[in-house]
Amino acid sequence: MCDNIIKFENVKKIYYLYKNEKEQFSYLFKSKKNIKQHIALNNINFLVNKGESIGIIGKNGAGKSTILKMITGVTFPTEGKVTIIGNVAALLELTAGFVPEMTGRENIYLKSYLTGLSEDRIKEIEDDIVDFADLGEYIDQPIRTYSSGMKARLGFSININIKPDILVIDEALSVGDASFRKKCHEKIISLVESGVTVLYVSHSIDSVLEICTRVIYLKKGNIVYD
């Protein structure tokens, strides 16, 4: 049985830099060879085995976030193939997807349901999510009354407690105050130890070394070290 849970095969991602919307529309029906291009990923190949914890490092614009967005289905390759086996939780845009008029607790059910969890399973983890977010009485107040930090705490808590097969993290450890960041860090390490596959983008080499057992170094859309 194959242990590969993530596979990138000759993956290329091109962003076309149009001058305006009119030009973008005109090129829907003809070749884009004359349009200025930004190659975010250039024929990337790598495999991730179940249970691996991988740090993805590189300068801004190296292609790190593009890889994470492909794993989470936010964007797709221009060429090549990406294969994902298992459910994915993403600590990317932690505050995205909340309904402002719904309470924090109601949003727990909504966001968890959208990840594919059953109502019974959500009930099982509800207390864990509430306790980890540590929002007190605000958990039953509308999200519109939350600060951005409170929304990020709740978003982190939901994604970290659904126990995914694959956890994708993009600098999420900057959430909240020092004590909450420490709690987040410890939770991620416990998930790694339990066998969750983790892909972690960070500018902190110390965090990568503590969490990850493998590092992929990207430069200008290419893997230069794995």
Regions found by a protein language model. Name each.
Residues 2-40:
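Pre-NBD coupling/linker segments of ABC/ABC-like ATPases
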Residues 26-27, 121-138:
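Conserved ABC ATPase "signature" region
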Residues 57-59:
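The feature captures the beta-strand-to-loop junction immediately N-terminal to the Walker
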Residues 202-203:
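H-loop/switch region of ABC-family ATPase nucleotide-binding domains
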Residues 208-210:
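A short, surface-exposed alpha-helical micro-motif characterized by mixed small hydrophobic
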Residues 220-221:
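Conserved ABC ATPase "signature" C-loop
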